[in-house]
Regions:
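Short, surface-exposed basic-aromatic patches at helix termini and helix-loop junctions that form
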Residues: 308-310, 444-455, 473-483, 506
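Active-site neighborhood of phospho(di)ester-bond hydrolases with catalytic His/Asp-centered motifs
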Residues: 207-209, 275-282, 312-322, 428-432, ...
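Active-site environment of divalent metal-dependent phosphoester hydrolases
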Residues: 215, 285-288, 318-329, 393-395, ...
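Bacterial N-terminal signal peptides that target proteins for export
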Residues: 2-10
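Metal-dependent phosphoesterase/phosphodiesterase active-site architecture
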Residues: 28-143, 150-270, 275-278, 340-419, ...
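N-terminal signal peptide
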Residues: 2, 16-39
């Protein structure tokens, strides 16, 4: 996760839209009633672009939350501004003619170059980022954004229906409904998981996420550089009177140095018994405006080497984060071939995770190459499934082409879980982006799968948010019976929280094991203290059962924890401090904040707050 990707990529999309409008060829619409020749002169085109850009930024954000209606009036008010001298309304007919011109415009290389130049200028004029970032980010995303626009099957009618509403044309909804299919096999009755007998074998599972390693991190450098990522060797010294980047890390929009990464792994290796590792994505840094594929692959291989060094012979089960690709969030479906294909990343994962490290069996290769996901039988009766959650990523522009179960991943998940149920196996599911933050329709289908196979799925493990969280799946609104839990482990990179990692204790490898999560221990590094003393000291932050007064980590117990937080501010405040890993700089959380955070726990499905 990155502030840049969620906050500014919407602006980038808007910039490309406004550039297309600003550079369009003459369109045939004198006004909305009489067809004729209508031409925007150069000055008007430029003015229109600058006026539309902030609107389009807002509209992009609103569209993501499915509340764009107020912005339609704003657009018309902008277009009708007398200072533009256009004298017409951009209403339905005019919009359709304009979109036809857009289709023509993006087909030539010359137009692409012009789009890039003007988009960069608009970015600078609106001060979305500094000049260097504007120039680089537009070029970084140029091919993806324009290729998606070229391949997109939206007609001018659909575009204008989306912009102007259904009175103009039927809007396009890339979040439109689709459903996975389930085999005609009755769902088994769910029975409470019995606690293991005293002395039963257990396993220890390390969960690390969101490493965000920055090979350009430089202690003492400018930590307030004005760019999305600072503390880098090219940022120069800090301003007079301002502290430079800390030796072990910094909370001011900075990522993880190689020294901190090595220190983290060394500490874990020395102090923890680890049977296997869940690594839930986001290995590269947040410099998303100037990353290359070779940059990403270098980090991928480096992390594999580090884990093999510090944990020899220990299996690692990785999943792909949204930052693994270049550009960030770019995960085209299998049918996209050529330069824009994601084959380069999936082949590298096979090379690193199967051939080099032997973490995964060769049987994982087929689905890894298809869509970056796999399953593996870890022990008899226990299977791990690793999903590529970018198939539901709202910032993955390729989903504008086709968002219906990309690469057939969720239908594949149904088949894996059904086979596991039949074989009486238990399953842990790994992913990067929690389902509650993905496309609503993808998240809905995932929820249907969880509800159907709740007795088979004994744990879900995600990252992305950088925070220590959990989420609950309930059977239905009426009963409110918790049936499954999503664990979000937090990040190693400092981002309004101290670096940290988690170790789960799970029911172990023996006949009739439940393979359930029995407890988890959470460790953190007080970054402020580490920078002051130059002696990083990792500490136990909390143990779940003790901290939340739980008898087990079954879904029903997590449900009880949530109900306690609703009526007991002290209980919530404790959770909130863990949310930030005891970071001293966390903001206070008032009653509205508490309500929203508790609702977030109860919202395991994207856009569905019915359990709040």
């Amino acid at each position: 996760m990155a502030t840049f990707s969620t906050k500014r990529l919407a602006a980038l999309a808007a910039l490309f839209f406004c550039v297309v409008i600003a550079t369009c060829k003459p369109v045939t619409s004198a006004d909305v009633k009489t067809k004729g020749e209508y031409v925007l002169d150069e000055q008007t085109r430029s003015t229109l672009a600058y006026k539309l850009a902030p609107f389009l930024v807002s509209y992009s954000r609103a569209a993501a939350t499915r509340t764009p209606a107020p912005y339609v009036k704003m657009m018309n008010d902008i277009i009708r501004d007398p200072s533009l001298g256009i004298g017409v309304d951009i209403e339905c007919d005019a919009c359709k003619e304009l979109m036809k011109a857009v289709d023509d415009l993006i087909q030539t290389d010359e137009s692409r170059d012009l789009i890039v130049e003007i988009a960069a200028e608009v970015c600078k004029t609106l001060e979305i980022e500094d000049d260097r970032v504007c120039d680089l980010v537009v070029r970084e995303f140029k091919d993806e954004v324009i290729d998606v626009a070229t391949l997109h099957y939206l007609s001018p009618d659909q575009v204008c229906g989306t912009l102007l509403g259904p009175s103009c044309a039927i809007p396009y909804d890339y979040n439109s409904d689709w459903n996975v299919t389930f085999p005609n096999i009755p769902k088994p009755h769910m029975t409470p998981v019995q606690p293991p007998q005293p002395g039963s074998p257990t396993l220890r599972v390390l969960h690390i996420s969101d490493l965000h390693i920055d090979l350009m991190y430089e202690p003492g450098s400018n930590a307030e550089c004005g760019e999305p990522l600072c503390c880098r060797s090219n940022d120069g010294p800090p301003a007079p009177g301002t502290k430079g980047a800390g030796k072990w890390g910094d909370f001011r929009t900075c990522d993880v140095s190689l020294d901190l990464m090595k220190n983290t792994l060394e500490n874990i290796a020395k102090t923890q018994k680890v049977d296997f590792i869940y690594m839930t994505g986001d290995l590269p840094a947040h410099n998303v405006w100037n990353q290359t594929r070779s940059d990403q692959l270098k980090i991928l291989d480096m992390v594999t080497d580090l884990l093999m060094k510090y944990f020899p012979g220990v299996k690692v089960y990785p999943t792909l984060g949204n930052h693994e690709s270049a550009p960030v969030n770019s995960f085209p479906p299998e049918f996209i071939t050529g330069d824009q294909s994601e084959k380069w990343l999936y082949e590298a994962c096979v090379s690193s995770w199967i051939e080099k490290s032997d973490w995964l069996p060769k049987s994982a290769k087929e689905t890894m190459l298809r869509g970056g996901y796999y399953d593996v039988l870890v022990y008899p009766g226990f299977r791990v499934v690793s999903l590529n959650a970018n198939a539901g990523n709202t910032q993955n522009w390729w989903l504008r082409i086709n968002a219906t179960d990309p690469d057939a991943q969720l239908q594949w998940l149904v088949s894996v879980l059904q086979a596991a149920e039949t074989a009486k196996e238990k399953v842990h599911i790994l992913g990067h982006i929690p389902p509650s933050q993905n496309l609503a329709v993808w998240s809905k289908n995932y929820e249907l799968i969880v509800k159907r196979y709740a007795s088979t799925i004994t744990g879900q493990f995600f990252g992305h948010t950088h925070k220590d969280q959990f989420k609950i799946y309930y059977d239905n609104v009426t009963n409110r019976q918790p049936i499954n839990v999503v664990y979000v482990a937090g990040a190693i990179t400092p981002d309004t929280q101290n670096p940290g990692y988690r170790v789960y204790t799970i029911d172990g490898n023996y006949t009739k094991s439940s393979w359930a999560v029995l407890d988890h221990d959470n460790y953190y590094l007080n970054l402020t203290e580490a920078n002051l003393t130059d002696k990083p000291k990792w500490r136990l932050e909390y143990t779940a059962k003790k901290a939340f007064n739980m008898t087990s980590l079954q879904p029903s117990e997590w449900g009880r924890v949530v109900e306690e937080m609703k009526k007991n501010e002290t209980a919530f405040d404790q959770y909130y401090s863990y949310f930030h890993r005891l970071w001293e700089g966390r903001s206070p959380c008032d009653s509205s904040c508490r309500q929203n955070m508790i609702c977030d726990i109860e919202t395991a499905r994207s856009g569905d707050s019915s359990f709040c």
